[in-house]
Every structure is written in structure tokens, then in C-alpha cells.
Amino acid sequence: MVSVPTGLRPSAVPGVRLPALADQVGAVMAGPDRRAAVPDVTVTGVTLRAQDVLPGDLFAALPGATTHGARHAAEAIERGAVAVLTDAAGVAQLTGGRTTPTLLHPRPRSVLGQLAAAVYAHPSERLTVIGITGTSGKTTTTYLVESGLRAAGRTAGLIGTVGIRIDGADIPSALTTPEAPALQALLAAMAEQRVDTVVMEVSSHALALGRVDGTRFAVGGFTNLSRDHLDFHPTMADYFEAKALLFDPNSPLRAHRAVVCIDDEAGREMAARAGDAVTVSAEGQPAHWRAVEVAPLGTGGQQFTVIDPAGVQHRAGIRLPGHYNVANCLVALALLDAVGVSPEQAAPGLLQTRVPGRMEEIDAGQDFLALVDYAHKPGALRAVLSSLKRPDRRLAVVFGAGGERDPGKRAPMGATAAELADLVVVTDDNPRGEDPAAIRREILAGVTESGCAAEVVEIGDRRAAIRHAVAWAGPGDVVLVAGKGHETGQRTGEHTRPFDDRVELAEALREAVGPRKAQG
């Protein structure tokens, strides 16, 4: 039974003296005399959030999008913070006579990872950390790696979009991509729980914003690159460069070893950038690891032959549909091999892997296939729909697009859906602060521009949209609800209401199956 550390922190931290921390990151005392000696207090934790402060913490007061963290310094100190780290703007906002040591750094975020790693005794050096990046497939690949590790008898930790796991147990957490202090604390807690290998998703945001600074990656994996996050990255080139921080020989974040899928141009460029990457391909590219003889396995699964760098053949199987998941599995196998787990050791775990909200089948006894998937960008939607499209069955897709995110992907998603599906139901995703109807219009513009003959319906209410697709489906058809996957809420404006595509689809199926059985 895994015991959960309070606040996902280790239960015991020896602590580091504040003067030593200041020296390590080049911080000085705030105030008129920048050469003043740094008080000799012991720091046992680091946090960005005043409400999370525990006695002995250093509170990092950073500039935010709308407010400066220094506004919350008084609360942090009241809760037991023994020191504050901030910039000049933060110092200017601190009020009253300061008795708590305040360290000044021109770019405090840039040193936060290094500082937190030092406080928690550099936990990634006590673990084998595998980092996986790419536009699509990160979550699935982390789950495949975790399953392979556990099948080989390793005590594994997982950090990703869906959540956190320690030795197979789900750990309640609101963290998705933890900030640097939370990540270092979590890695230290995992080390304390005798985890030996951690597999984690590494987003472009995490790399660009320093959230994984201070982490030593034993192996880095790259899945693919397609359009996404252009609300954050100004160009696709900038997006690529953020991912490349995990592989570039000149990057301080560079993983000790690299595994790269070269089935797209970005992967081939990334392999060249890394210089000594282990390559994988499910598309016939010349690579160290290859998949051949792909065949169906049961309902929705696949089996195939894996050829390793020595030319040895191994049989592998996954309970996940879609050829892109063969590529994800190859990346997982190569990563596992890099940390000493053979394909034979990993195989039983791979076959048992289920990933929440990723091509997740919902079965209520209906006579057609119903799935929920997280695909929320053009490339991912194309990959999923292509894997489901067959001439002997009809395909329906229910999807929308998130508000306050890259608007340039909306029309391409509409065009992709119209090209590959027989029924396209355009609905709301997470509109956030945007007009939901305006988002739907942008998607529908792409549908129109495609010139495809798919049946198209606009239903803003996501629950009603799902029910429409279920009512449309006949024996042997496929219904895909895409975009939200594992998410359990729908955000409109400032309000998030409970909403789970898996729950809604299951309920719609149960309602539909009853009358159909009665008619039969």
C-alpha cells in the first residue's frame, strides 16, 4: 500500500542553508546593501503558492500574467515561510518592515528548478527519469512504459496529463504539468517511496518555462510533431525548438540518451539534432527499432513483430487501436530497453495497458463500437479517424475546439472530420471565455471549405450532441467522441461544470440499447 506524502512532498527533508542556496543561484539580499550577509536559516521546502506554504519553506514570489506573487508574500510568511525569492518588481511590492530574508534575482523563475532540486537533495539523481515529449502520444507512451517497467518488477512512478501514479496506485492531485518546485518535491517523494524509475510527460510549456529545470533525464523520448500550442509558441519552428531542449547536445536539459520516432519530418530532424539517437519507425523508415507484420488482435487490439537494433525479432501486442499506437509502442520498447527492460520482460505489461480517455471503448451492450479519445488537434484527429475508417462501416465523430487556444486549428479540424467521417457533429469543447457559437462557426467553415459530402450537424450542447450520434449509429458502425478524453469538467467562462465524455457516452448508450433490444 502506497502512503501518500502530504502535499505530494517527501516526509523528511534535511534542508539547505539559505546562504548556500543564494550562492548556487546567484541571488543577493534585497535592500540598500546588496552585499549584506544572507541570514543563516534552513530551507526545507519551496513553493510558488502562498496557500501551500509549510513551515521552513522558501516562497518564490514570481511575476504572473495578471498579478505579482509578491502580493501574497505576507500570507506565505504568516504560514511559516522562512525566506522569499523575488525580482525587483516583487521587492517594490513587499510592504512593511521585512524581517524575513528576501533574496533578489533578476530572473527568479530561471533559477527556481535548480534551487528546488538543491532543497530536495537532487531527487532525479537518485532515480532513473524517462521524459517523453511530442505533440501526440505522450500519455499513451508513458502508460506503456509504466506497464513495461512494472511487468519487469520495477517500482515505477508516472507523472502526466491524466494524473500521478506510484507503484500502480493513483495519487489524488490537481497537478498536470507541475511547476519546478512541485515537480522536485514529487520526485523526492517518489524516491522516498522506493520508486526506482519515473516516466513523465514533458510538454513544450514545461521545457520553455523551466518547469523541468533541475531534472536529470536518463532517457528522452520523442513521438511526433504537428500543429498545436500556437497560442503559446509564435511559430512551429519555436515549438520544435522547445521540444529540442530535451535532445540538443548544447541544452542543459539534454537527456543522457535519446529515443526518437522518425515517422515524420520533425522526428528525422530531431534525430539529426540529437546526433546519437536511437530511432524507431512503424512506417518502414530505416531505423534501429521497426515494426512489421501488423495484424488485428481481438477487438481493437494489434499484434506485430518488433525488430530490434541487433536484428532480433520479438512478438508484441497492445489492446489499443490505430497504427500510430504501434509507433507509440515502439518508442516505449526502445525507452524500456535503454533502462534495461527487454521486450520479453515488457510484453505482458504492454498487452494489459489501458489509457484513460485514449481510444477508450465504452461498451453498454450496443451493436456498434463507441470510443472516447483526447484528440483535440488536426493531426491527432486525422490519425484517430484514419485508424477507424473502413469501407464496410459508417463513422460518426462528435467534437469541438477549446476556447482561448490556437484558433488556427479549428477549420483544419473541421475539414479533417468532413473528409474522414460520415457524420460530423460539431459541438462545444471547453469554450472558456470565448463565444461557443463563434468557435463552432470556425470549425464549420473548415467543413464547408473541404467540399466533402459528410452529413454535418451543429449541436452546441455536448450531451445532446453525443446522444444524436448514438441515435444515428447502426449495427457495425463507429461513434467517436473526441477532444476531452479523460477530462471530468467542461469550462465555460469562469465556471467549470462536471462533464465526462465517458460517463455521458455510457449513459447515452444505455438509454439507446434498451429500446433497441425491446424492438428486437
From Swiss-Prot:
Motif (Meso-diaminopimelate recognition motif): 429-432
Subcellular location: Cytoplasm
GO MF term set: ATP binding; magnesium ion binding; UDP-N-acetylmuramoylalanyl-D-glutamate-2,6-diaminopimelate ligase activity
Role noted for this protein: Catalyzes the addition of meso-diaminopimelic acid to the nucleotide precursor UDP-N-acetylmuramoyl-L-alanyl-D-glutamate (UMAG) in the biosynthesis of bacterial cell-wall peptidoglycan.
An annotated GO BP: peptidoglycan biosynthetic process
Main localization category: cytoplasm
Signal peptide: none
Protein name: UDP-N-acetylmuramoyl-L-alanyl-D-glutamate--2,6-diaminopimelate ligase
Organism: Mycolicibacterium paratuberculosis (strain ATCC BAA-968 / K-10) (Mycobacterium paratuberculosis)
NCBIfam families on file: murE, PRK00139.1-2, PRK00139.1-4
Pathway: Cell wall biogenesis; peptidoglycan biosynthesis
Positions of UDP-N-acetyl-alpha-D-muramoyl-L-alanyl-D-glutamate binding: L48, T176, T177, S203, R211
Keyword field: ATP-binding, Cell cycle, Cell division, Cell shape, Cell wall biogenesis/degradation, Cytoplasm, Ligase, Magnesium, Nucleotide-binding, Peptidoglycan synthesis
Binding site for ATP: G134, T135, S136, G137, K138, T139, T140
Cofactor(s) needed for function: Mg(2+)
GO cellular component, one term: cytoplasm
Modified residues (N6-carboxylysine): K243
Record-linked PANTHER family: MUR LIGASE FAMILY MEMBER, UDP-N-ACETYLMURAMOYL-L-ALANYL-D-GLUTAMATE--2,6-DIAMINOPIMELATE LIGASE MURE HOMOLOG, CHLOROPLASTIC
Coiled-coil ranges from the UniProt annotation: none
